[in-house]
């Protein structure tokens, strides 16, 4: 383990940001000891903060990033680099994209630097059994070693699961759970924890809304459930909330409303995997809880940032 006094956090952030303006794909190879420091220090902060975060607006919320590091940099260029704005990320930082390491390292570095202004939740890909398969393990093994992947797993197992903004906006990676009756159930979950195959924690990271159903139904993913607009309305009414904000699904415009604007899906990886022609979006919540969207067009289109 590196002696933490030797590690220069500002230098790590500077090197990660140095590639702004370089050709997308240029890598930043931090020292293994520096990455271990990021994982260990961030883990301490996650554990010291609640598993169900209670946050205040104004805040900017981002959905899946999936290793698209240069798009993450574009999001910050658009929304303001921390601490210019407060941020909440909804999970899925690793896998599928080419630069999971830079992506997660910058997010962890900002978490350590600005622990009260920068927040990241756990996605279903911040789980060893998933990121072992979809790219992160291979990237760690290729660029560093398997032991480092295990260090990330220890860190991911301590990430918070959900956040409530000003008691009115409920955010998580996936969606609601048929097992969720009270917020206290989330608060009681002990960390470190893996993501189980079923139950509350699994659903919060895996479930999806479905406009064509009533109640709960099985999910095509083979994990968790889907839930209808009636479930969303009942939940918000019961908990006196206004909006559910989640990620987990690619949506064409980067954001998509559901159930009469009672739920919004955010996806922040434009041109996802190079296979989709989707935009990416970031949701800005102002002090009065008014939500607006900032759109990142797919980079390929050679357009600067569009707004809508």
From Swiss-Prot:
One of its GO terms (biological process) is deactivation of mitotic spindle assembly checkpoint. It is an enzyme of class 3 (hydrolase). Mn(2+) 2 binds at residues 92, 124, 173, 248. Binds 2 manganese ions per subunit. Mn(2+) 1 binds at residues 64, 66, 92. The keyword Transcription does not apply. GO terms for cellular component: cell cortex of growing cell tip; cell cortex of non-growing cell tip; cell division site; CENP-A containing chromatin; cytoplasm; DPS complex; mRNA cleavage and polyadenylation specificity factor complex; nucleus. Its EC number is 3.1.3.16. It holds the Pfam family STPPase_N. The keyword Hydrolase applies. Keywords: Cytoplasm, Hydrolase, Manganese, Metal-binding, Protein phosphatase. Belongs to the PPP phosphatase family. PP-1 subfamily. This is Serine/threonine-protein phosphatase PP1.
């Amino acid at each position: 383990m590196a002696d933490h006094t030797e590690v220069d956090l500002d230098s790590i952030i500077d090197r990660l940001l140095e590639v702004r303006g370089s050709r997308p794909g240029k890598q930043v190879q931090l020292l293994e000891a520096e990455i271990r420091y990021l994982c260990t220090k961030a883990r301490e902060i996650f554990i010291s903060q609640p598993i169900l975060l209670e946050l205040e607006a104004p805040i900017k919320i981002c959905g899946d990033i999936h290793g698209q590091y240069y798009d993450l940099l574009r999001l910050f260029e658009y929304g303001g680099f921390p601490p210019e704005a407060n941020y909440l990320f909804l999970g899925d930082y690793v896998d599928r994209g080419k630069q999971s390491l830079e992506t997660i390292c910058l997010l962890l570095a900002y978490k350590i630097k600005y622990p009260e202004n920068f927040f990241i939740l756990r996605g279903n890909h911040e789980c060893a059994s998933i990121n072992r398969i979809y790219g992160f393990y291979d990237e760690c093994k290729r660029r560093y070693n398997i032991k480092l992947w295990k260090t990330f797993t220890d860190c991911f197992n301590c990430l918070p699961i959900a956040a409530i903004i000003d008691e009115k906006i409920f955010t998580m990676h996936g969606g609601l759970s048929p097992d969720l009756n009270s917020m206290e159930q989330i608060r009681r979950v002990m960390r470190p924890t893996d993501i189980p195959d079923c139950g509350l924690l699994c659903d919060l990271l895996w479930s999806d809304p479905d406009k064509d159903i009533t109640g709960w139904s099985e999910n095509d993913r083979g994990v968790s459930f889907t839930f209808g607009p009636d479930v969303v309305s009942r939940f918000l009414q019961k908990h006196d909330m206004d909006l559910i904000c989640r990620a987990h699904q690619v949506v064409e415009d980067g954001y998509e409303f559901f159930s009469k604007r009672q739920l919004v899906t955010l996806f922040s990886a434009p041109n996802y995997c190079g296979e989709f022609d989707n935009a990416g979006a970031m949701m800005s919540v102002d002090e009065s809880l008014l939500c607006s969207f900032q759109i990142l067009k797919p980079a390929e289109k050679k357009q600067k940032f569009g707004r809508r």
